[in-house]
Regions:
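A conserved helix-loop-beta module that forms one wall/lid of the active-site cleft
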Residues: 32-115, 120-142, 148-150
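Phosphate-binding site of ATP-dependent enzymes
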Residues: 92, 116-194
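Charged, low-complexity, helix/coiled-coil-prone segments
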Residues: 1-12, 32-33, 65, 164-181
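Phosphate-binding glycine-rich loops and adjacent basic patches that engage nucleotide phosphates
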Residues: 2-3, 19-29, 84-86, 181-194
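Generic intrinsically disordered, low-complexity segments enriched for polar/acidic and small residues
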Residues: 3, 11-12, 17-18, 33, ...
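Glycine-rich, flexible loop/turn motifs
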Residues: 26, 51, 153
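Intrinsically disordered, low-complexity segments enriched in polar/charged residues with Gly/Pro
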Residues: 15, 84, 98, 156-158
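Membrane-proximal basic amphipathic "stem/tether" segments
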Residues: 1-47
Length: 194
């Protein structure tokens, strides 16, 4: 539905108000946002720091982090490709992660634990779909507007813990950290802890 609405309502402010109302069931307050979700919409419209585009592109974000704190904090890259047909599947190790550079969430992320049973055709189809997704058009997240859709493969990190690897997210309001969210069991039974 977002893709269709994008072309009907080209103005970012009107579009975000409409989508917010449809998803949240209430009016979006942009003049004095109080709720976290309202503040996020305000940021989409008024905080246009060009550095954000580097941060949402998974490939350029890795380069940025490496330049700031060092390569040892970066998951090693196995390959980068512009299209699915260019992926050199035979050169990838038995375990790896492959994902698109232009998306958020997990729609374009695939964790391979055993390449011998990987359905390359299915993963390729899903990667192609993810490469065509446009978060800027769907949600007006402007940092994604100029991200070149690519595919990146990385080493697969594993944990000895029963819950697997943990993903920490720090949420800030007005520049201050307010919440820490820990995601775990993302491969089997997704759980969050606030």
């Amino acid at each position: 539905i977002c893709r269709k609405l994008y072309f009907l309502f080209p103005g970012d402010c009107f579009y975000l108000k409409l989508i917010y109302y449809l998803e949240m069931g209430k009016k979006l307050r942009l003049k004095n946002p109080k709720a976290f979700s309202e503040k996020l919409q305000w940021l989409k419209l008024y905080d246009r720091n060009p550095e954000y585009t580097k941060m949402v592109d998974k490939i350029s974000a890795k380069r940025y982090v490496a330049s700031m704190i060092g390569e040892k904090y970066i998951i090693p890259t196995l390959g980068v490709w512009d299209k699915v047909e260019d992926i050199e599947w035979e050169t990838l190790p038995d375990k790896f992660v492959i994902k698109t550079s232009n998306g958020g969430g997990g729609g374009g992320v695939f964790i391979c634990k055993d390449k011998s049973v990987l359905d390359i055709k299915s993963v390729s189809k899903k990667l192609n779909f993810a490469l065509k997704s446009n978060i800027y058009q769907q949600y007006r997240e402007w940092p994604y507007k100029n991200v070149k859709p690519r595919i990146i493969a990385e080493e697969c990190l594993e944990s000895e813990a029963e819950t697997g690897l943990k993903d920490y997210k720090v949420f800030c309001c007005n520049g201050e950290p307010k919440l820490i969210k820990v995601n775990y069991d993302v491969e089997t039974d997704y759980k969050s802890n606030w």
